[in-house]
Amino acid sequence: MTFGRRPRQQERGFPLALCTEATVDLAEDEELMQLMGLANFWSVFVGIESPNEASLIETKKLQNVRPKAGTLLERVHRIQSHVLEVWCGMIVGFDHDDRAIFDAIPKFVDDARSGNAALIGLLHAIPTTPLHVRLKESGKLNDEEASNRYGTNVVPLLMSREELRDGFVDAMRKAYTLDAYFGRTDALFIGDGFRFAPQQRDYWAPPLAKRGAGDYLKFLAVASRLLISVKEPALRSRYRRQLWRILRARGLGPQILLICAIKIAMHYHYAAITKALGEADRADGVMPDAMRSFSRAEHVRAAEAVPS
């Protein structure tokens, strides 16, 4: 397939790395995915929401439940095969979620090879939305105190509030253990030999040479700062092994080295979040922001900023 004149990104050595959001229907548009690769899109955020089909139907996320298009996993892998990394957005707390969801989500994330790109959150009912109205009318909304205690204003249907809160913490821990996280990144970037579209060309052919040298410098900066800054011996040792592992497996391609160094650094961020979740004293009724849904945390911060 031809696409006319050579894209501006290619002519200038791909100076812009792009990302976007899309529905999983993207997997069915071959031409669009090819064009995204040529335009230097690196990643796409996809609202998977849940591996539980009943929850997807409940939320009218019907494009995620289309057997003729393939399973969710098959469609994620199809997008990845077009040199686009998929960031999966996942939510727990739907009416059809029971305790099994806390094992199902980490398994889906692993099978999807979603690396660091798995964003797991608690369902939160935003005021004035149909969900908020329905929950309010059915008496399934937490009050302010309970929202702070459980991290969300949603009262689950098939489990207790404590089970939802503790199950969410458990799912986060499972998803971001060292072995789980790096198992996913290894599966994608080493086992599958994942390459972003510009790497299909000779990296050192003009005008990519300047970009390649810059990526080497950035890789060295990220890797050295990471190994100096991380104080926990177990984390630092694993990060060092991962850096050597990618060097041995993928050689000296500057872009892939930089991306993988960033992936390793991002694990440190998730490790801090899961550590905060594990250390939270759930008996005192005060939840850290890491345990709250994003909208809930923003609401609390906004309230605290208002002068008394």
Give each language-model segment a name:
Residues T2-G212, A221, D289-S308:
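A structural motif corresponding to the C-terminal lobe/cap of the Radical SAM core domain
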